[in-house]
Regions:
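Noncatalytic alpha-helical scaffold of FAD-dependent oxidoreductases
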Residues: 1-166
Length: 168
């Protein structure tokens, strides 16, 4: 498996479902996926785990400003991982290649200052910011369906904010 292009340092996640990219589905999981997708797929659509190359995402709606390039990604992999959560409909839409609203950018800040810079830029430029924790949302909370109220969307991945600090 070739190394994907990402600003994330975590093990490569499956962009289309639960788990890591180097893990294979069991026979039972394969059957479950086929059953899930067949409910929503028209005309017995062939079921196969999607590949990054299967997707043609629209370009980001705004150009990434220089001030954010150190920690904000526009790679296809990062945008796919952050397009949906891991609910049944999310996984089925990935298998059917239905990515209607991928985030324009994906931020991986490592400092509070970077979060502040991102939020200030987003506020000033009418960009929706969508928090992303571990990527296990099953209620649509990470989806970038922002309508026409915003110019663009950024998924704010909190991967590097994994410590609880208590100030006494």
């Amino acid at each position: 498996m070739s190394k994907i292009e990402s600003l994330s340092e975590r093990a490569e996640l499956r962009f289309w479902g639960w788990g890591y990219a180097d893990e294979h589905l069991s026979a039972q999981e394969d059957q479950l996926v086929e059953a899930m997708v067949s409910v929503m797929a028209p005309n017995n659509t062939e079921i196969a785990p999607p590949s990054i190359d299967d997707f043609d995402l629209p370009p980001p709606r705004l150009e990434l400003p220089e001030v954010l390039t150190a920690f904000v990604s526009t790679t296809k992999y990062d945008r796919l991982v952050h397009s949906y959560g891991k609910s049944y409909p999310d996984i089925v839409r990935m298998f059917l290649h239905q990515i209607d609203n991928p985030p324009d950018w994906v931020a991986f800040p490592k400092t509070e200052q970077q979060i502040s810079e991102l939020l200030a830029y987003a506020s000033k430029n009418n960009i929706a910011v969508i928090p992303f924790g571990g990527g296990t949302s099953v209620c649509g909370g990470v989806e970038s369906d922002i309508g026409k109220d915003y110019q663009a969307s950024v998924s704010l991945d909190l991967e590097y904010f994994n410590l609880s600090l208590i100030h006494i």
